[in-house]
Amino acid sequence: MAIKSVPILICPNCGGPLTLQEIDQCSCEQCGRDYPVTLGIPDLRPPEFIVKGHREVQVVEKLLDIYPSSDHLSLIKAFFSELDNSQVPKHLVSFYQEHLIHQVNRGAQFTEMFIERLESQYPLPDYRIACEIGCGIGAGLLALSKHFDFVIGIDPDLATLIVAKKLCEQYHLENLLLIQAIGQKLPFQANSLSYITAQNTLEHIFEVDQLMQEFARVLKKGGCFTADSRNRYDLFFPEPHVKLRWVGFLPRRWVNAYVHWRIGMDYMKVHAQLLSYWDLRRALQRSFPNRWRILYPKASAYGGSKRIDSLIDILSNLPGIAQAGLMIFPSHLALAQKQ
């Protein structure tokens, strides 16, 4: 869909309305700033967040070169082959690649779980416009497009958005727009979105309070937000990015040195900071006072059995024990509604 047909978009610099003047350029009517457009994907990042290294440019050029003759899976593999994994242990390289390849199927399971749990707590005002923050290669976009009139995918990385663009083309999605942007400063008018969702994303955005404030700004009255958040104090499974147990129990300033000592990898490379139950609770309460919940997610959405889901349902209904269990459970499901 053309950018000019999405009137909720605003300039990240001044907040003015955006117009599409040329096929490869988007301009602000108010301040005159121009924003480049690649394959119909506008770059609406604030200037201070634009850092283009040689490696990033190289990956994008490779994907654009093979784009016309490639399918979604081929682009995923090409994208992964261009990443600098020289300092990453081999077992993690294999894990990252498999994670990417199966991300769309997992994204559909997450999307359905999010909406099912949300509808049991807070009714959506309508099913008009949904936005996925950190959409990456398009994990949840297909499923969202079946529920909402229009879907917007946001990610700061152009290379992954190019891969997502191919997925949308393969499934002939007409009700979707991809935008290179950041969650901390969304290029949307206030009170414009019905639903915001984020899969495996919160731990990669360190300014969680700012992120939640932006969600509250752009959601319309009654609009809702859902996200999963891996627990910093998970007792049961290894840290999801480096596969080491109990990393979150260390002081944050020690984590990088510990991970490097154990597996020879710089933890900052994964750009992750897992949230505890209390971290997540504080962020939700500040932006969505009294209209938020932290629930147990379905284990089946992560590849677990439905039998575990049944046990989790029992646990979640035990007074006192349910909240205590959330402190150490592997993952949290955050729900919120704007009043």
PLM regions and their residue ranges:
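Conserved N-terminal segment of class I S-adenosyl-L-methionine
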Residues: A2-Q189, Y195, F329-L333
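Class I S-adenosylmethionine-dependent transferase superfamily signal
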Residues: L144, E214-F215
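Active-site micro-motifs of SAM-dependent methyltransferase domains
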Residues: K185, E203, R232-D234
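A short SAM/SAH-binding and catalytic strip from SAM-dependent methyltransferases
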Residues: S194-F206
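Helix-to-beta-strand junctions that scaffold the AdoMet/dcAdoMet cofactor pocket
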Residues: I205-F206, L219-K221
